[in-house]
Design a protein with these regions (language model features):
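Catalytic Walker B motif of ABC-type/P-loop ATPase nucleotide-binding domains
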Residues: 163-167
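Conserved ABC transporter NBD signature motif
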Residues: 60-68, 77
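Conserved structural motif at the start of ABC-family nucleotide-binding domains
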Residues: 6, 21-22
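Conserved ABC ATPase signature
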Residues: 113, 138-142, 146
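Conserved ABC ATPase "signature" region
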Residues: 101, 116-134, 159
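The feature captures the beta-strand-to-loop junction immediately N-terminal to the Walker
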Residues: 37-39
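Helix-to-loop junction immediately C-terminal to a conserved catalytic motif
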Residues: 52
Length: 189
């Protein structure tokens, strides 16, 4: 196996005292494309959120590039792992490009505005996901599948070595479902 990007050791997760996944251990190497399958409610999204640090773990260890997740700041972790959540609500007033630009925030200081380079990168990611023509369109006016592809462009604009895609094909027709998996295969290389 190549260099370990993610190591999960004896991880138990759940809500309160209710354990959803117990004693999970696995390692993912650089360039690997991994899918998590299971029944509805089995804990797949909970696992991703816990590994990403969005939910507390009950026990165990999560390492990114050999470093414990707890040693990362939120900003530093956002430079390592981009996460496309299963359900994302987008408020009024945001355009497609606004959403994609949010992927650049881990690289900006609080006083900085996005650079021309950031804007170019965002548009390139929108081009890659077939959403470039939606850059100036309010996200409230696009279809569910178009919104999903805009959100994929956002995680790509984050330029992280690790992507968590939680049900990335939700709301997409068959053609775009195949495209998402093609993107994932290309990105894993």
């Amino acid at each position: 196996m190549s260099e370990a990007v993610l190591s999960v050791n004896h991880l138990s997760i759940g809500y309160g005292s209710r354990c959803v996944i117990s004693d999970a251990s696995f390692t993912i190497g650089k360039g690997e494309l991994v899918g998590i399958i299971g029944c509805n409610g089995a804990g797949k999204s909970t696992l991703l959120k816990t590994i990403r640090g969005m939910l507390p773990k009950q026990s165990g260890e999560v390492l990114f590039f050999g470093k414990p997740m707890e040693e990362y700041t939120d900003r530093d972790l956002a430079r390592e792992v981009a996460y496309l959540q299963q359900q994302v609500e987008v408020g009024f007033g945001y355009t497609g490009q606004d959403i994609v630009m949010a992927g650049r925030y881990p690289y900006l200081k609080w006083w900085e505005r996005e650079s021309e380079n950031d804007k170019r990168l965002a548009l390139d990611c929108m081009e890659y996901t077939g959403t470039r023509e939606l850059a100036d369109k309010p996200v409230t006016e696009v279809s569910g599948g178009q919104k999903q592809r805009i959100l994929l462009a956002k995680v790509l604009a984050q330029q992280t070595p690790v992507l968590f895609l939680d049900e990335p094909t939700t709301g997409l027709d068959m053609v775009y479902q195949e495209e998402i998996f093609r993107f994932a295969r290309e990105l894993a290389l």
